[in-house]
Amino acid sequence: MAIIIPESSYERRVKALYEKQIRMEALEGKFIKKVYKFNSNLLDVKEAVLRHQRKVGKLQKVVMERREELEKRVSFMEELAQELEATKLRNLAMKEQIKQRKMIARQRKNEIMERIQTLSKTTGTYVNQEALPARVKGVTVLRGDKRDQLIPFDLNATDAEGLNSLCQHLESLNVDVSQWQQLVSLAMDVAMEARAPTTPPKEVANCKSIIEIDLTSPTSHQA
């Protein structure tokens, strides 16, 4: 038969302290685990925050680049619109200038044609426009009481001697050579404007000066 020895109050206190210590150690272990888990979670959160910040930084950089690009495009479009408007205004101004020049050219041509008709009637001379500017071709009609006298002419526009002789002959027949020369010169101008290339031949460019012969020059008195 076992003998039961009752615990003393001291032993009970020691045992209670021991059990309390075990519970505290268990609680401490749990607390340490929770702290470790918290720190681990906190580190994960910090890393996630850093990753998010990096992404945000990249996005902000992209947004800034896109904004700068958009601003450049807007500026380019504004400059382009201004340039287009300026070009439009220049084109309108050029069209107006061309219109004015054409109108002036028509007026000048009409005036020249009227002058040609007047000189043609005054001198009784018809100039073949199709032959100009290479040749001076036509006919001068001298009105007479009984019959008219026809004086045809067909000369190279550069034939200064031939033109000079023709002018002297017409002058001897009381034809106003000055008006005759004006007629041929104006007809030459019209023909050159209608047919002249971008760079007219030298002989054509010299036609006008050749036709306007000075009857007082020594050459005019050789015949």
Curated annotation (Swiss-Prot):
Residue ranges crossing the lipid bilayer per the database entry: none
Domain of life: Eukaryota
UniProt feature coiled coil, ranges: 51-119
Presence of the UniProt keyword Membrane in the record: no
One cellular-component annotation, GO: nucleus
Predominant location: nucleus
GO biological process: cell division; meiotic metaphase chromosome alignment; meiotic spindle organization; mitotic metaphase chromosome alignment
Family, as annotated: Belongs to the SPC25 family.
Function: Acts as a component of the essential kinetochore-associated Ndc80 complex, which is required for chromosome segregation and spindle checkpoint activity during meiosis and mitosis. Required for kinetochore integrity and the organization of stable microtubule binding sites in the outer plate of the kinetochore. Participates in SAC signaling that responds specifically to disruptions in spindle microtubule dynamics. The NDC80 complex synergistically enhances the affinity of the SKA1 complex for microtubules and may allow the NDC80 complex to track depolymerizing microtubules.
Protein name: Kinetochore protein Spc25
Organism from which the protein derives: Drosophila teissieri (Fruit fly)
